[in-house]
């Protein structure tokens, strides 16, 4: 166009300034593309039922249970499963009502009930928005693969993590959560057979025996 100088011949400081602006815009564009392509934490389902296998370092045991999870009302119900005959093994049902700050422990055979105060705050089963993306990979063999993403609480100032969560790419179902301390696994839970929704909301209602509940936690073995 008449009267418009080529960029490389703009007199004075205006030329370098325009070049700097173009360079900055180019960098911003590249950053935007990177941000769009970067994985972001998905939103896990708020209400679902399934099964879990939990390993606790303190006991050295794996425990199996049915799980009802209600994130909307901050409550969880865990029902111990018997998968093998273990001498002197008592099976319990646990109802955790975080809004009320209480947990009920009910022995399945006798309905004996203990009522205890929840000391830990509600911690939803999902991926925190400030989590660090670690990896994406498939579980299973050919024709049976499920894509999952691995997230952690690792930060740049710390080279190790204390929490790792694995969730499916599709629908954001929980697959596994692992907690570590001093490089050792202290708690690891695997989730499977997940179905959306709560089939029977009454599972969160303690039985009538809990009206006269004791205040001490019952032992899992026969030494009561």
Curated annotation (Swiss-Prot):
The keyword Signal applies. N-glycosylated; the glycan contains mannose-6-phosphate moieties. Glycans are attached at residues 130, 182. GO terms for biological process: cell-matrix adhesion. SMART domains: EPEND. It holds the Pfam family Ependymin. It is found in: Lysosome lumen; Secreted. Keywords: Disulfide bond, Glycoprotein, Lipid-binding, Lysosome, Secreted, Signal. It comes from the Eukaryota. Its main location: other. Disulfide bonds join 42-172, 88-222, 113-210. Residues 1-37 form the signal peptide. One of its GO terms (molecular function) is calcium ion binding. GO terms for cellular component: extracellular region; lysosomal lumen. Belongs to the ependymin family. Binds anionic lipids and gangliosides at acidic pH. Homodimer. This is Mammalian ependymin-related protein 1.
């Amino acid at each position: 166009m008449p009267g418009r100088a080529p960029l490389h011949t703009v007199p004075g400081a205006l030329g370098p300034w325009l070049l700097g602006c173009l360079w900055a815009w180019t960098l911003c564009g590249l950053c935007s593309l990177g941000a769009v392509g970067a994985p972001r934490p998905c939103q896990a389902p708020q209400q679902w039922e399934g099964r879990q296998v939990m390993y606790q370092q303190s006991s050295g045991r794996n425990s199996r249970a049915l799980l009802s999870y209600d994130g909307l009302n901050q409550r969880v119900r865990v029902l111990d499963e018997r998968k093998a005959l273990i001498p002197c093994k008592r099976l319990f049902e646990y109802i955790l009502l975080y809004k009320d700050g209480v947990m009920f422990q009910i022995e399945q055979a006798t309905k004996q009930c203990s009522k205890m105060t929840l000391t830990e705050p509600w911690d939803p089963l999902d991926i925190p928005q400030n989590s660090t993306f670690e990896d994406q990979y498939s579980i299973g063999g050919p024709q049976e693969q499920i894509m999952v993403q691995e997230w952690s609480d690792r930060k740049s100032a710390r080279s190790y993590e204390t929490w790792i969560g694995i969730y499916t790419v599709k629908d954001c179902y929980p697959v596994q959560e692992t907690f570590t301390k001093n490089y050792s696994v202290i708690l690891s839970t695997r989730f499977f057979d997940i179905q959306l929704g709560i089939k029977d909301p009454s599972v969160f209602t303690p039985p009538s025996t809990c009206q006269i509940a004791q205040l001490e936690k019952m032992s899992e073995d026969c030494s009561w």
